[in-house]
């Protein structure tokens, strides 16, 4: 019986650079293959070749699908064959309904009139297949990201998909939404639909995959049954070396208190009867990494947004720096007090995509490069930019390159460089490694550790508990806007943190574990 998919000796070059170099892979019907590799390894390029985003003739090699050679010139050609790709950036029209999105460009007609009734019934059936209980007439923009992801899958099922490519599908999803998505993929597998799954989250890769294919520097490193590979083996194949200690295991010299927060309360920006943060108090010390853990909606992000003057709703409470009360009503006041923040949503709040890397890095610190008569000191600015790029190992062909063209890891390091140009005493990192590969994560962890050695106090928020536990000296556990526990991190486990988050008492507990 032939394979569902064979990609034979695929090579795709851009000028003299081979983004994909002689890569071959096979896939069976009803099989889940995870494609792993660092950013820039060639994964996305290979999938764009498969889906004819790069058309036949623009690459070398051969693609066989369901026994026939695939010579597609447009993504519509591959969709007609039963191949669909869902990108991390969803291709839905937010102002249109679920039904309108599902049939966009493929509307059903009867006697020359839109067959709305049958489209509605079909849409309902497709939504039921992905376990999404929403009315087809709901505007897509009113749905959460997890629900939108399921609409994309339902849309693919409506096109009789036989092979579904999912590129970083859970990067912006909650743990619950991720669990639902993985269940849907298992259901698709049981119905004979094959999946190619691209993710940096190796726990998901291990949980969902039948086979794992690793690509590094455009080359095929190996394809093995998932059961034969540990996460450490996958990492070693991806980066070409073993990361024996993902989190820097170095003791921190914790100094005096630099920040104290007392009775911080923040209300929902629209529904002012709801408290997003409820009477939160804590302290932070020089040279300390304070992790904040909790389920999505626990109030973690809202807490640090208040500290940085970025919260859009009403809040109250007292903030002390070096024991002195300070007023922080906006980001400028926070930066003046020595606070810098890497935001949760890098693309929305951290960068200006159309501007160059250098412009993004210096945007918040232009006064440092302003000389007499308010003239910009270009030479000094360029010198500091070069130094920052080198120190943080930001890979870019030019400081003037649009930052949107960098990989996620390099964008994040550029945002971090922007913060460090402010010479902060307190650095807030909200989801610092979201959507970036394991090698870039390792570099960012080393950077955080180096900053702490310079006596900078760091607050880390992450939805990945291993990250919080691997980095932090102390962990605040939040639930429903309140601090449920303040835990000293001595071999602290994920189970202990989750138990604290779900504990019914509303008082904070100081626990040394």
Swiss-Prot record:
SUPFAM superfamilies: P-loop containing nucleoside triphosphate hydrolases (SSF52540). It is found in: Cell inner membrane. Residues 5-242, 259-505 form the ABC transporter domain. ATP binds at residues 37-44. Keywords: ATP-binding, Cell inner membrane, Cell membrane, Membrane, Nucleotide-binding, Repeat, Sugar transport, Translocase, Transport. Its EC number is 7.5.2.10. SMART domains: AAA. InterPro entries: AAA+_ATPase (IPR003593), ABC_carbohydrate_import_ATPase (IPR050107), ABC_transporter-like_ATP-bd (IPR003439), ABC_transporter-like_CS (IPR017871), ABC_transptr_XylG (IPR013455), P-loop_NTPase (IPR027417). Part of the ABC transporter complex XylFGH involved in xylose import. Responsible for energy coupling to the transport system. Belongs to the ABC transporter superfamily. Xylose importer (TC 3.A.1.2.4) family. The complex is composed of two ATP-binding proteins (XylG), two transmembrane proteins (XylH) and a solute-binding protein (XylF). This is Xylose import ATP-binding protein XylG. It comes from Pectobacterium atrosepticum (strain SCRI 1043 / ATCC BAA-672).
